[in-house]
């Protein structure tokens, strides 16, 4: 299911009692739905995999960000998607920001501007990671995380140029759901990272 959080809940409640394994590719799934999915997966011995992103590069980006985070004091994340993307920032951007902050073990420096000439120009801030979102035609999904420290920056970037980038992860999740009863959240768990 790749609809939305509400659709994901409906699919889980419909499929699990029928002993059908489930793969969900929606973001913004509330904790209550995750708890229900965990309960239903256990009760009916089915595999339920919920992954906010199926692009291997995006999953690896999140992992690399966590490794790099302790060595830097500043972090800015820019995400750009197609104009029909309904949420901002994207679920992947939120996951990258949260994982980056976890890797840091605290908050990054996010100094507010002394004078902001256009409101919101510096973006939103999540645990010190400043997040900027753009929506426009000609894009699929792009995430760029720039770390900063005295005299240096480190950039980690992932670009999904076409939706084909999601297929290897989807196929992996479908194959894994059959072998992995219970709830699994995130493709990183399947990859073992």
Please identify what each model-predicted range represents.
Residues 6-18, 25-48, 59, 63-68:
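Rossmann-fold NAD(P)-binding glycine/threonine-rich loop
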Residues 4, 8, 30, 89, ...:
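Short, conserved glycine- and acidic-residue-centered signature motifs
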Residues 24, 48-51, 77-79:
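General beta-strand structural signal in soluble alpha/beta enzymes
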Residues 27-29, 53-55, 80-83:
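Short, ordered loop/turn segments at secondary-structure junctions
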Residues 56-63, 95, 169:
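Short amphipathic alpha-helical face segments that pack within enzyme cores
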Residues 73-78, 82-193:
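C-terminal substrate-binding/catalytic lobe of Rossmann-fold NAD(P)-dependent oxidoreductases
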Residues 21, 53, 87:
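Short glycine- and Lys/Arg-enriched binding-loop motifs that mark or flank ligand-binding interfaces
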């Amino acid at each position: 299911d790749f609809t939305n959080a509400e659709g994901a809940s409906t699919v889980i409640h419909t499929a699990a009692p029928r002993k059908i394994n489930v793969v969900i590719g929606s973001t913004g799934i509330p904790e209550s739905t995750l708890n229900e999915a965990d309960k239903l997966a256990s009760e009916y011995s089915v595999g339920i995999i919920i992954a906010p992103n199926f692009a291997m590069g995006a999953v690896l980006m999140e992992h690399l960000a966590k490794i790099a985070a302790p060595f830097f004091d500043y972090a800015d994340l820019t995400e750009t998607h197609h104009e029909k993307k309904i949420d901002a920032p994207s679920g992947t951007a939120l996951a990258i920001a949260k994982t980056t902050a976890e890797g840091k073990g605290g908050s990054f420096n996010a100094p507010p501007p002394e004078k902001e000439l256009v409101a919101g120009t510096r973006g939103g801030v999540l645990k010190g990671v400043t997040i900027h979102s753009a929506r426009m035609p000609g894009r699929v999904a792009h995430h760029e995380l720039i770390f900063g420290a005295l005299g240096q920056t480190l950039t980690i970037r992932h670009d999904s140029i076409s939706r084909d980038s999601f297929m290897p992860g989807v196929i992996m999740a479908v194959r894994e759901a059959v072998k992995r009863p219970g709830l699994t959240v995130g493709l990183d768990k399947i990859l073992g990272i």
